[in-house]
UniProtKB/Swiss-Prot annotation:
Substrate binds at residues 35, 77, 115, 156. GO terms for cellular component: cytosol. Pathway: Cofactor biosynthesis; ubiquinone biosynthesis. It comes from Salmonella arizonae (strain ATCC BAA-731 / CDC346-86 / RSK2980). InterPro entries: Chorismate--pyruvate_lyase (IPR007440), Chorismate_lyase_/UTRA_dom_sf (IPR028978). Removes the pyruvyl group from chorismate, with concomitant aromatization of the ring, to provide 4-hydroxybenzoate (4HB) for the ubiquinone pathway. GO terms for biological process: pyruvate biosynthetic process; ubiquinone biosynthetic process. Keywords: Cytoplasm, Lyase, Pyruvate, Ubiquinone biosynthesis. This is Chorismate pyruvate-lyase. The gene is ubiC. Monomer.
């Protein structure tokens, strides 16, 4: 199963450098903290609609080429992050199989738990970069994060109902 928002997410084109942005957009797109937490600060109940969680081969995560280690399998998680039931963000997480050892194995068992609830409680979380992307009408971003030095790639597309707009 897929979702049209995930097709748009995969179509994002990334800027080579951070573009000039209105302060409001910049505040959302370059947020270093948890997007889940930011949505909750809007006074909303945040929930996850799980679209897909599975191991996939390299051909299904081509956008990660050059950003993650080359491996035979990756854990792929695709979700909609909803605020009071309304989709605000489409998310796609690509995790190399080698990252899934030790405590990071929990990434395979998040189910309907927002990724941010796990990531941003870890004292071992670091972020290598944030890249800003855009399709015809929507903004997005991707980040390479590390847990205990082990990488994962998180891509987020802000949907029309999101307070980013």
């Amino acid at each position: 199963m897929s979702h049209p928002a995930l097709t748009q997410l995969r179509a994002l084109r990334y800027f080579d450098a951070i573009p000039a942005l209105e302060p409001h957009l910049r505040d959302w797109l370059l947020l270093e903290d948890s997007m889940t937490k930011r949505f909750e600060q809007q006074g909303k109940r945040v929930s996850v609609t799980l679209i897909r969680e599975a191991f996939v081969g390299q051909s299904e995560v081509e956008e990660a080429s050059g950003l993650l280690p080359s491996e035979a399998r990756y854990w792929l998680r695709e979700i909609l992050l909803c605020a009071d039931g309304e989709p605000w963000l489409a998310g796609r997480t690509v995790v190399p199989e080698s990252t899934l050892c030790g405590p990071e194995q929990v990434l395979q068992h998040l189910g309907r738990t927002p990724l941010g609830r796990y990531l941003f409680t870890s004292s071992t979380l670091t972020r290598d970069f944030i890249e800003i992307g855009r399709d015809a009408t929507l903004w997005g971003r991707r980040s390479r994060l590390r847990l205990s030095g082990k990488p994962l790639l998180l891509t987020e597309l802000f949907l029309p109902a999101s307070p980013l707009y």
